[in-house]
């Protein structure tokens, strides 16, 4: 009897260790994909120029005239958070804050920046979310805490572009989910519109989908 109990206890402990180890691996795989993000950061401009050739002359023009600029703020934990921004070709109060998706960065949203800046004549600000691009951080936060950073970037954009803007916040994928989370907070009068492009309904649903598609595991 004692031998059976020992076997059961050892089996339960072993199973618990496997589950714990697997869970930690999945969390690291999902929220700290360092190699993937380093590769994407290093190749962002060339990737975007390959996918969207019209971006190169536009970005070259912005850089040549000093119109494409960087700015940094400190996050709630003291981390440096980075963004790029550019004024519209002609003075305007119309302003877009553009939020990227999972493992992407500000540069990889320049096709949307082009739409707002070049085609629609808006000021633009594109932040690197926590742990993405040139921003610091410990892990991807899937939008929930990022909403507070985006709210701060909205204030920064309003200050940069004159203090009395008319603002749209546009997000894609995880950035779209972040945008919807932002929309649930109290807003300043200058915020006029939110654009949600392909956001997820919940982090749980998103992780369940990825577990099934990438690993064939039930969730």
Mark where each language-model region is.
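The serine-hydrolase catalytic nucleophile loop
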Residues: 102-116
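Short beta-strand element of the alpha/beta-hydrolase
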Residues: 93-101
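Alpha/beta-hydrolase fold nucleophile elbow
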Residues: 161-173
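Conserved alpha/beta-hydrolase
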Residues: 116-136
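A short loop-to-beta-strand scaffold at the N-terminal edge of the catalytic core in hydrolase folds
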Residues: 76-87
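Hydrolase active-site cap/lid region
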Residues: 181-219
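An N-terminal hydrophobic leader/cap segment in hydrolases
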Residues: 4, 15-73
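Alpha/beta-hydrolase active-site loop
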Residues: 139-161
